[in-house]
Amino acid sequence: MAKGKRTFQPNNRRRAKVHGFRLRMRTRAGRAIVTARRAKGRRSLTA
C-alpha cells in the first residue's frame, strides 16, 4: 500500500508568515494570544 508524501515540509519563512509575531499583532485576537502567553510565562511567544 503506497503512502502519500510527508505532510510537514519545514520552511522558516512560511512559519513566520503564518504564525509569526507581526501577524499576531495585526488582529485583536492575535494580540490576546500573545498577552495570554506572556501572562502564562511562556518562553516562546510566537513562531
Curated annotation (Swiss-Prot):
Domain of life per record: Bacteria
GO annotation, cellular component aspect: ribonucleoprotein complex; ribosome
Record GO terms (molecular function): structural constituent of ribosome
Keyword Cell division: no
Gene Ontology biological process terms in this record: translation
PROSITE patterns assigned: RIBOSOMAL_L34
Keyword tags: Ribonucleoprotein, Ribosomal protein
Annotated Pfam families: Ribosomal_L34
PANTHER family, sorted: LARGE RIBOSOMAL SUBUNIT PROTEIN BL34M, MITOCHONDRIAL RIBOSOMAL PROTEIN 34 FAMILY MEMBER
NCBIfam families, A to Z: rpmH_bact
Sequence similarity: Belongs to the bacterial ribosomal protein bL34 family.
UniProt protein name: Large ribosomal subunit protein bL34
Record organism: Mycolicibacterium vanbaalenii (strain DSM 7251 / JCM 13017 / BCRC 16820 / KCTC 9966 / NRRL B-24157 / PYR-1)
Name of the coding gene: rpmH
